[in-house]
């Protein structure tokens, strides 16, 4: 989801400035030997646990409560406690994030684990757009849906998860091209 919803939509800007740089993408679910598999850079979500590599914090994951405008109209949501009364959409890899969100607001959250569960954020986003429920989604994944009005925020409060995004490089020296790409990513993280 990070690559398809944040990185790739911004990539034409980088390639317009650096058309001599070739970029390829591959998905891995676990840390691997970057040098042996000929990777210059990896983007890792999780904790700082990649052996034999140089890890640099890229950004944290901040999530915001959203739903479709129709869902918000159908359910009276004026404050965070109102979200305890509506269907909630969950991401399987972050099963307790709603519970943490409510507890952060000082609310009891026994019902926060109920609702529909999905294994990809793209499905959670589609479910929220389809008015299946309220969702906690990383802000960077829903920039387009928010700007187009297909999703609206339900509370000013956000929650930052315990995991982060890291830029991971082999421990040996990396090329100027990788350095340019890393700097470009850092410059674009807040945009």
Predicted regions located by residue number:
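Central regulatory/effector-binding core of bacterial HTH transcription factors
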Residues: 1-51
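Residues that form or flank phosphate/diphosphate-binding pockets in enzymes
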Residues: 5-6, 75, 162, 176
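Short amphipathic alpha-helical coupling segments at ligand-binding clamshell hinges
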Residues: 6, 138, 173-187
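Solvent-exposed, non-membrane alpha-helical residues enriched in polar/charged side chains
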Residues: 12-15, 99, 143, 182, ...
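Hydrophobic packing within well-folded, soluble alpha/beta domains
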Residues: 14, 23-25, 127, 151, ...
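C-terminal regulatory
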Residues: 32, 36-38, 48-132, 137, ...
